[in-house]
């Protein structure tokens, strides 16, 4: 059977596979486009298995927030090279996945996300198909989701740094829907998303710090040479003072606001000023931050 250019083009548009791959698949399938798709999928899955052992440390973090501003999501998708990370297919996959995560709280677990439906196929199979098409290992590594509690007014915003190297979600709680739309509140949300990106807090406020983390910090401080040997009451006073530095680094509202040119105002002061400006309570609901490649060991060039 003659394989026409139109048949090849249609199959390529449908699958994203290369011209020669489509032509060979159509020939093997005797011109049947549906069987040709199966041929490509089978080949893609085989290729994916061969690529799976490679280190995928590049890629991007995709971010999305709903038009209503009540939910947002982040997804980190890794590949092997920056070139692939900038391709339309790779970026498109990441953008579709992040919308899935926003719509489904359970999908923030990447194992659950792999089983979700995407264009009539399992996400895991879509990823494997793309591996076969692109020729690099691709890993959906992490996801995060942030939503306002049911019945709570506020907004969720996202911030992407350096073209997707870092992604941030930041949520604010307000007393009213009108307050959530106020210019000062929107500006605060965007500024705090930038703060989270730059200053890397671990908690919103000190009340969120787990007891075991605090105890470990106290043990570290108590073991320092200039603390040892002093009376217990003096040790406790010194340790408490130094814990304030820990809070100032680890807790968002205790951090120095990065947009303060004098470096004196804390984030809590900026939140209080915003409350005064809009005439109602405003507080931070939470945040999420993903940095591309955190914890992935990059293989040195040969």
Please report, for each region that a protein language model flagged, where it lies by residue.
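N-terminal assembly/interaction segments in proteins that build large macromolecular machines
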Residues: 2-302
């Amino acid at each position: 059977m003659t394989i026409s250019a139109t048949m090849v083009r249609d199959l390529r548009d449908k699958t994203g596979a290369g011209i020669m791959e489509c032509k060979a698949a159509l020939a093997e399938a005797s011109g049947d486009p549906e069987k040709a798709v199966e041929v490509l999928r089978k080949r893609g899955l085989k290729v994916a298995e061969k690529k799976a052992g490679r280190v995928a440390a590049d890629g991007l973090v995709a971010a999305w927030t709903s038009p209503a501003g009540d939910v947002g999501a982040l997804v980190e998708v890794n590949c092997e090279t920056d070139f692939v990370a900038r391709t339309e297919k790779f970026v498109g996959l990441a953008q579709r996945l992040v919308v899935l995560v926003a719509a489904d709280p359970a999908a923030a677990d990447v194992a659950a996300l792999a089983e979700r439906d995407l264009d009539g196929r399992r996400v895991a199979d879509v990823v494997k198909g793309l591996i076969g098409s692109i020729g690099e290992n691709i890993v959906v590594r992490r996801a995060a989701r942030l939503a306002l509690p049911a019945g709570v007014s506020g907004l969720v915003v996202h911030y992407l740094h350096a073209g997707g190297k870092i992604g941030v979600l930041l949520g604010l709680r307000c007393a009213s829907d009108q307050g959530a739309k106020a210019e000062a509140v929107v500006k605060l949300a965007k500024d705090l998303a930038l703060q989270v990106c730059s200053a890397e807090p671990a908690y919103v406020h000190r009340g969120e710090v787990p007891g075991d983390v605090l105890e470990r910090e106290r043990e570290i401080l108590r073991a320092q040479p200039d603390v040892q040997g002093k009376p217990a009451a003096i040790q406790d006073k010194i340790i408490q003072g130094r814990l304030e530095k820990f809070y100032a680094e680890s807790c968002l509202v205790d951090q120095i606001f990065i947009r303060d040119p004098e470096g004196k105002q804390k984030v809590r002061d900026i939140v209080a000023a915003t409350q005064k400006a809009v005439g109602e309570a405003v507080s931070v609901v939470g945040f999420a931050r993903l940095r591309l490649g955190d914890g992935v060991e990059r293989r040195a060039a040969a």
